[in-house]
């Protein structure tokens, strides 16, 4: 895993199918202050049973989409992370 620095507490928000699978609309999670997005996604998938939608999830850090899962994310205490599956509709 590629993670550095101290551990911080972030607020994770779940939307649509991810909310259903996680069985909660939000959670507080301890994460390294620096972590590669793909490693973070793997941790969330395992902890919240999101494997069935992993390949379709979008992450957003403080309302900014994480577009490249190889990017390192820098977290501060109390930051927000959204877990967003593709939205369907018509």
Curated annotation (Swiss-Prot):
SUPFAM superfamilies noted in UniProt: MoaD/ThiS
GO CC, alphabetical: cytosol; molybdopterin adenylyltransferase complex; molybdopterin synthase complex
Gene from which the chain derives: Mocs2A
Family stated for the protein in its record: Belongs to the MoaD family. MOCS2A subfamily.
NCBIfam families cross-referenced by the UniProt entry: moaD
Role noted for this protein: Acts as a sulfur carrier required for molybdopterin biosynthesis. Component of the molybdopterin synthase complex that catalyzes the conversion of precursor Z into molybdopterin by mediating the incorporation of 2 sulfur atoms into precursor Z to generate a dithiolene group. In the complex, serves as sulfur donor by being thiocarboxylated (-COSH) at its C-terminus by MOCS3. After interaction with Mocs2B, the sulfur is then transferred to precursor Z to form molybdopterin.
Residue(s) carrying 1-thioglycine: 90
Subunit-level organization: Heterotetramer; composed of 2 small (Mocs2A) and 2 large (Mocs2B) subunits.
Cell compartments where the protein resides: Cytoplasm
Name assigned to this protein: Molybdopterin synthase sulfur carrier subunit
GO molecular function, one term: molybdopterin synthase activity
Cited InterPro entries: Beta-grasp_dom_sf, MOCS2A, MOCS2A_euk, Mopterin_synth/thiamin_S_b, ThiS/MoaD-like
Residues recorded with modification Glycyl adenylate: 90
């Amino acid at each position: 895993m590629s993670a550095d620095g101290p551990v911080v507490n972030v607020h994770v928000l779940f939307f649509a199918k991810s909310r259903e699978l996680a069985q909660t609309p939000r959670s507080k999670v301890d994460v390294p202050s620096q972590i590669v997005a793909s490693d973070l996604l793997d941790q969330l998938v395992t902890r919240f049973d999101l494997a069935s939608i992993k390949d379709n999830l979008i992450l957003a850090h403080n309302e900014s989409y994480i577009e490249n899962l190889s990017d390192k994310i820098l977290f501060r205490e109390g930051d927000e992370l959204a877990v967003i599956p593709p939205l369907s509709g018509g």
